[in-house]
């Protein structure tokens, strides 16, 4: 395999894992692009992005432009490096055409969906929310559009019924390096393929989307909860408080035709609520300013029986 000079652009954990794996290959990482450092927490302590941490540990130069309009000098610095390829995954900063034109073999984007399905910001969450049974990693030749470039390689992944956005994210973090290295190996001869099919869009997640609609089926609610785990978290409103849900299971049919959203019963093992077709049991709940707890632990300090028969929403 030919040794390539690569510039890597990414910011969060998933990007950091791919970068770690890329360092293990024979390719040369010339520089890393990541978002600017952020002040976080009560003490406003400056934190580096996960990608920056990995780059510094490997003694690689790091560029952190606020934007390429505000920091045009970064483009010039990248041009001087004359990279063969720029690899991008979850960078989070818009790149201009001038950036895309720099590398010899173009810019490769690692996108975690089977394009053209779920273009955009939240492909993992939207795939689970929609009840998809499969997803994948696409290595895409970047162009000026939103995830519209030609496909160079694909790795398909099954979505299990127990997968959350966190577990699927972790799978992508481990598996994305395989199709990337395959693509880099054949970069001189690989034939880009235009995306086929009707595109769908994975719009950015909002905090308010976590609210559970119990008029939906138990399966739809399961998809909703798993899609929004860990963030923003799925929840229902009880006594004007947002109660986040944790572990759950789908039980028997709603044979008594209880109205969707009715709290059927509360046991030490769970909190049972009717959906449009079945009963769903929540084994864990999180009340405001509290930790996520098993129902048995909540019952030790809180009277929940008074809510039996109460209809949510």
Swiss-Prot record:
GO terms for molecular function: methionyl-tRNA formyltransferase activity. It catalyses: L-methionyl-tRNA(fMet) + (6R)-10-formyltetrahydrofolate = N-formyl-L-methionyl-tRNA(fMet) + (6S)-5,6,7,8-tetrahydrofolate + H(+). Keywords: Protein biosynthesis, Transferase. Its EC number is 2.1.2.9. Transmembrane segments: none annotated. PROSITE patterns: GART. It holds the Pfam family Formyl_trans_C. GO terms for cellular component: cytosol. (6S)-5,6,7,8-tetrahydrofolate binds at residues 113-116. Disulfide bonds: none annotated. InterPro entries: Fmt, Formyl_trans_C, Formyl_transf_N, Formyl_transf_N_sf, Formyl_transferase-like_C_sf, GART_AS, Met-tRNA-FMT_C, Met-tRNA-FMT_N. Gene3D superfamilies: 3.40.50.12230. Attaches a formyl group to the free amino group of methionyl-tRNA(fMet). The formyl group appears to play a dual role in the initiator identity of N-formylmethionyl-tRNA by promoting its recognition by IF2 and preventing the misappropriation of this tRNA by the elongation apparatus. HAMAP family: Formyl_trans (MF_00182). Belongs to the Fmt family. This is Methionyl-tRNA formyltransferase. The gene is fmt.
């Amino acid at each position: 395999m030919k040794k390539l000079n690569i510039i890597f652009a990414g910011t969060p954990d998933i990007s950091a894992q791919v970068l770690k794996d890329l360092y293990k290959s024979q390719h040369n990482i010339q520089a890393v692009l990541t978002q600017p450092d952020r002040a976080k927490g009560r003490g406003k302590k400056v934190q580096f992005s996960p990608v920056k941490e990995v780059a510094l540990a490997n003694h690689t130069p790091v560029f952190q432009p606020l934007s390429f309009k505000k920091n045009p000098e970064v483009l010039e610095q990248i041009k001087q490096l004359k990279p063969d390829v720029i690899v991008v995954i979850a960078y989070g900063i818009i790149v201009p055409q001038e950036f895309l034109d720099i590398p010899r073999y173009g810019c490769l984007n690692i996108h975690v969906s089977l394009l053209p399905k779920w273009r955009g910001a939240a492909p993992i969450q939207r795939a689970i929310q929609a009840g998809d049974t499969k997803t994948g990693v696409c290595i895409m030749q970047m162009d000026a559009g939103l995830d519209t470039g030609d496909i160079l390689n694909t790795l398909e992944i099954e979505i299990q019924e127990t997968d959350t956005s966190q577990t699927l994210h972790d799978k992508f973090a481990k598996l994305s390096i395989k199709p990337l290295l395959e693509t880099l190996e054949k970069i001189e001869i690989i034939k880009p393929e235009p995306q086929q099919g009707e595109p769908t869009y994975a719009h950015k997640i909002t905090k308010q989307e976590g609210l559970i609609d119990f008029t939906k089926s138990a399966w739809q609610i399961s998809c909703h909860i798993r899609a929004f785990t860990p963030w923003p978290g799925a929840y229902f409103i009880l006594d004007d408080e947002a109660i986040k849900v944790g572990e759950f299971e789908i039980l028997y049919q709603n044979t008594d035709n209880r109205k969707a959203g009715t709290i059927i019963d509360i046991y030490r093992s769970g909190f049972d609520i009717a959906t449009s077709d079945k009963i769903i049991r929540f084994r864990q709940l999180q009340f405001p300013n509290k930790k996520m707890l098993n129902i048995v632990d909540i019952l030790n300090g809180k009277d929940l029986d008074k809510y039996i028969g109460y209809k949510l929403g």
